[in-house]
Amino acid sequence: MHDDRTVVEDRLTRLLTDRLRPAVHRVVAGLDVAAWHVPGEPVPPAAALAGGDFQPFPVGGAWGPPWGTTWFRLTGTVPDLPAGSRVELVVDLGWNTASPGFQAEGLVYRPDGSVHKGLHPRNDWVPVTGRAVDLYVEAAANPTILDGFRPTRLGDRATAGEAPLYRLARADVTVRDEGLAELVHDLQVLAELRAQLPAGEPRGHEILRALSRAMDALDPADLSGTAEAARAALGPVLARPAHASAHRITAVGHAHIDSAWLWPLRETVRKVARTASNVSDLLDTHPDLVYAMSSAQQFAWLEEHRPEVFARVAEHVRAGRFVPVGGMWVESDTNMPGSEAMARQFVHGKRYFLERFGIETREAWLPDSFGYSAALPQIVALSGTRWFLTQKISWNQTNRFPHHTFWWEGIDGTRVFTHFPPADTYNGELTGAELAHAVRNFRDKGDATRSLLPFGYGDGGGGPTREMLARARRLADLEGSPRVAVEAPASFFAAAEEEYGSAAPVWVGELYLELHRATYTSQAATKQGNRRAEHLLREAELWCATASVRLGVPYPHDELDRLWKTVLLHQFHDILPGSSIAWVHREAQATYAAVAASLETLISGAVAALAGGGEHEVSFNASPFARDGVPALGAAPPPAVSGVVTVSDGVQLDNGLLRVEVDARGLVVSVLDLVAGREVLAGPGNLLQLHRDEPNRWDAWDVDPFYRSLVSDVDGVTELSVAGDTVRISRAFGASTVLQEITLAAGARRVDFRVEVDWHEQEKFLKVAFPVDVHTDRAQFETQYGHLTRPTHENTSWDAARFEVCAHRWVRVAEPGYGVALANDSTYGHDVQRVPRAGGGTASVVRLSLVRAPRFPDPATDQGRHVFRYSLVPGADVVDAVRAGYELNLPLRTVRGAAVEPLAHVVSSPPESVVVEAVKLADDGSGDVVLRVYEALGGRATATLAPSFAVAGATETDLLERDRERDALGEGLTLRLRPFQIATIRLRRS
């Protein structure tokens, strides 16, 4: 037989495109359209329906300046039609070729203000019952920003302009031909399946012949009348069951809705309502759909802003078909959030689902975050969560991850059962190509037989469609295809763990994403706002709890809850990483300022109450380490400053413990550890280095390895001066200026640095370097509740790919007997390189990433003034590094008043190995005191708690403060902790 595959394929493509799909909706009447262009920001629906100034509007008319809202009123009459006709409006707001969720969208309302249905580019129909049509469409003119990576002013309403972006292309009353629609699905599923089969596979030829027969049976002059004959020709090939060994795919309806990204937070509120409305309609009409939605924040937005949609969602949740997943407040970044913030994502997320729906979510759901902290498995497990899902590691730039289903082991040894969907998408459409790729790509064949595939339009929302569900029904048991079952994620995980749990491989350590490494640095103000807010929250909880226990001052549960949720929202994986539009980051800065002001009010009130006033100064120390005579977590008079810093020409600072030499270029050329008798530096330190930064794509997200060869040192000096114990250096480069300060305080075992940058560069990357005279091939980096060790060599492609990494407050390099730490107050990006050392051996160049200047999606990223603080700590062991990180981020607060005893003393062995991360009152309002501690050194430790208030009992709890079956508390409030173990202790007050 001659090979006519291409002829058949081309014939089918034209048939679907030019004849069948357009014929599914037959126009029977037009609609009258009126429009009201909302001035400014969106208004509540009730206000629009009651007070909108609607004027006649032509189909084809222009509407929608960027970020504007236009309300359309659609009226008309359905003509007489045969009984059983399915009448639908088809509305085209002017869709473009971009994906749904990245352009105009709409939400349809009835005249009484109730929500009817969402409108998206591939979900443009509205069901109609009755003869009269009277509906309103709230249309959002969201601009298409993801169009290459070119700089755009569309990312902020203040700069986006007023020119309309869209034209109303269509508003029709139609009759949907169900027979033709079903034929389209039959043809498409079979054609896509055949395209993925091997060329010599008999099944493919069988399908090809069936497609030819079906097209022969179809009369273009009577498509509707001949559709059944065409379907009959396809029936036998659609009826063939899948092979017994066919891979099994759990298809989960889903819409990945970024809580902010290329749109502001206020638009996400509306996106969630549109998608949830569409999904609710599908659940009503398609009993085979199961839909999963993450992010408690998005449910809360529905509850607050669209309560009628929330009520429908809640009904489907109770039926088990609208499934909350993830157990987090938002799908956050997991690299940069601090210890408590990462825990509170699960506390607030899981508690919301428990309180609203009585549901304990079991699967952590983070398909799109930019790598996953090695501390996460323990945090996940301590929240009562059992499984973990992501897809993002498939984006790796260099190495292909070796597993799709495996146990993930964290820094403390906790393991969680983990799955990466091998379809390599969280926005699946259940196409033949996706399913075939999932099967071919699956790395665990032979031992495991199943995988998960989230399907539905996402990123900007949209969700599953009836077309996707039609495909799923045909793919449930079809020869040549994997078996597709639409199920809840928990069904997949339970079956996968039962099948493969005992044999699944183990991955130890972080799930590092070999991409998007610049997200540790972009949008410095957002990152600084986050870091400051996290530490102010710690202080507020500590001092408010202390004031409540000591003085009976009411504990501000509600205010702290509000502030925590605000901070958690802004840790979303496109806000904290700095990869959103200008609008998002401008608002984030204002929000962080408001959060800080509210927290300062709480802190100052609690501190004033505790201090009680008086003539003498008292310093409050929120750090878990005693400091300058002030106890950890308490307050005492500050000690008199002792010691002398001598300053000599050259410039040289000497406090008897360290001697720091600064040359005429303002560089630190020597840090002599007078106690250890050794030089700390192997070359000039505090050296600013400016890189060209022109990533291949994803400007705000990426820094590519070639940036390292495009570097110049910033060592020109415009002014150098000395004031007291501080050296000040002014520099200028490009369009920017820098003021650096170097301070050696009396009695200090560290050198403090402050750099103020007035930054006006484009596509540049500024780092500060310290060549440390330490020979090692690894470095330690702080993460949540501990630290991890990474190689600093490039022996393998996995090592080389980690050329930019994330750390929290400190990084440390060490050789046996001596270490050096570099602590910071707001920086996350780091790199550590090994370089030859004069005299032999190697040194370690430790660099902090300070500021970037990408142009997409925010063309003005990081322009303006920034202040960074960091400290070099010679002779540092891990405890010294941990202490320096806390002290730099939790400065003493000095007021007038009396000393305050800590609520609890923690005495550990080894000394200071057990760190108090949080002191607060219990969330249930009982007044119990909750302490969260962790082992910080990576070894075993014993800690004794000594409360300074009457305690009726103590229990270990999970992160949600529920008693655990296994209790780490021994007699006498003694804790025995394994390496990096987190323990939450509830102290019940008498």
Segments (PLM) and residue ranges:
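Histidine-centered catalytic/metal-binding microenvironments
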Residues: 1-42, 162-263, 534-642, 919-920, ...
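N-terminal catalytic cores of secreted or lumenal carbohydrate-active enzymes
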Residues: 2-13, 77-78, 90-336, 344, ...
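Short beta-strands within extracellular/lumenal beta-sheet-rich domains
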Residues: 62-80
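Extended extracellular/luminal ectodomain segments enriched in beta-structured repeat modules
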Residues: 79-89, 748-749, 926
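The substrate-binding groove and active-site-proximal loops of carbohydrate-active enzymes
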Residues: 217-224, 255-271, 294-303, 327-343, ...
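C-terminal (or distal) subdomains of carbohydrate-active enzymes
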Residues: 376-382, 395, 404, 431, ...
